[in-house]
Design a protein with these regions (language model features):
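Alpha-helical membrane-spanning segments of integral membrane proteins, especially the hydrophobic core
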Residues: 65-81, 110-126
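Perimembrane helix-loop junctions in membrane proteins
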Residues: 23-37, 100-104, 151-161
Length: 163
């Protein structure tokens, strides 16, 4: 099931990023269409403000205020595609962790720790798109979990040596 979902996420990411590239490529037509729809009242200004929420919020706002709607939408799609790829990678490493849990006599193994570190780093990177504050809190929690698992691996190694 997780493999199917990973493939689905990757396909979605590719389609979203491809759509962003197409929108950027058709920039003149898209900008003209959205501009006339705004002028005609068919689209409200608040309907397109979501695209102003790019990684650098000032950039998205400047693009929309300057009438470059296609570039704002395209960048938004590219960032969304990258976020979906990050989710697929997190799912991949988390599924490897649980697979190793099932096959191992102890969760405190170096391979599990390595996959856990990678998954937690990807989660911190993913949360950074929501804001720096939540990313810092997530990073501190991830650091605590990693330290607990490192200590558990050390205790497991000592236990294995005494047997």
């Amino acid at each position: 099931v997780t493999n199917i979902f990973k493939v689905f996420l990757i396909v979605c990411a590719i389609l979203v990023m491809l759509g962003g590239i197409i929108v950027i490529g058709l920039g003149g037509t898209v900008n003209q269409g959205i501009g006339s729809a705004l002028a005609g009242g068919e689209i409200k200004e608040r309907d397109i403000t979501a695209f102003a929420e790019l990684g650098e919020r000032e950039l998205g706002r400047r693009l929309i205020e300057g009438g470059d709607y296609a570039l704002a939408i395209g960048i938004y799609a590219m960032i969304s595609g990258i976020a979906i790829i990050l989710l697929a990678l997190v799912l991949h490493f988390v599924s490897r962790i649980f697979k190793d849990f099932m096959e191992s006599y102890s969760p405190f193994q170096p391979g599990i720790l390595k996959n856990l570190k990678i998954a937690l780093i990807l989660i911190v990177v993913y949360t950074a798109q929501s804001g720096l504050g939540i990313a810092v809190v997530t990073a501190m929690a991830a650091w605590c979990v990693i330290n607990i698992f490192e200590y558990g691996c050390e205790l497991q190694r000592q236990s294995d040596e005494t047997l």
